[in-house]
């Protein structure tokens, strides 16, 4: 993957944008160029932050001439919002809308060539977002969460019952003004967590930057919402071209369900990977997927 001398990436800027009066933090990457460039707006999945391997993808994209805005959802990472670690689907979709609006407002960015890139839970968010924004140039949905019921059924029933109990306790507590009841995002098999498949805990830890203290938990009330979230059902309304990067052995977002929803997308491409949900961020699996994503970008939203 050669770099053009005109596209040598600058160090990212740490920026903020407003989302319903809450400041969201982001890295803004720009290629060295004097012309308006396409912009890729990026965010992570379940409890993830911009520091968890998203910068690796952004660095590859900016080296090819694309600007990137990599943001943290409110309540997470470096973004504002209380209580911390509250995963609220409506708020996160609002953050996507605000991030796109901010990207379109920037100088030397072509507002008609904005791409959105999401992974895991964020891979579902970009589908829901694109269904309501016909101005987007393209969508990349990586190992996406598409169906709350399907993902819930992939879990051990006993774990599901325990999570529901914690969620109800947290929800009731939130009404009474109590502190949030937290539940682990990832844990070893047999432990209660949102992700406890055999590859989940080690895979999640592999995304953490060295020496980081990113919390591995979220407010449990989220469990009451995830089972009712079906972003995959909106794919038939998406007008932009969509690249689905599907992990065939995905333990978190079942690939069979993803493929069913992807088939209803009017303009879509599907790339298969014989990798698990967490493998795609690192090593050879990362090299394969980022190469395919760059190929898609160059064909669909080429840098002028």
Curated annotation (Swiss-Prot):
InterPro entries: AB_hydrolase_fold, FrsA_esterase, Xaa-Pro-like_dom. SUPFAM superfamilies: alpha/beta-Hydrolases. Induction: Down-regulated in the presence of H(2)O(2). It comes from the Bacteria. Keywords: Hydrolase. GO terms for molecular function: carboxylic ester hydrolase activity. Involved in quorum quenching (QQ). Inhibits motility and biofilm formation. Could contribute in bacterial competition, as it is capable of hydrolyzing the signaling molecules that mediate interspecies communication. Belongs to the AB hydrolase superfamily. This is Quorum-quenching protein AidA. It comes from Acinetobacter baumannii (strain MDR-ZJ06). The gene is aidA.
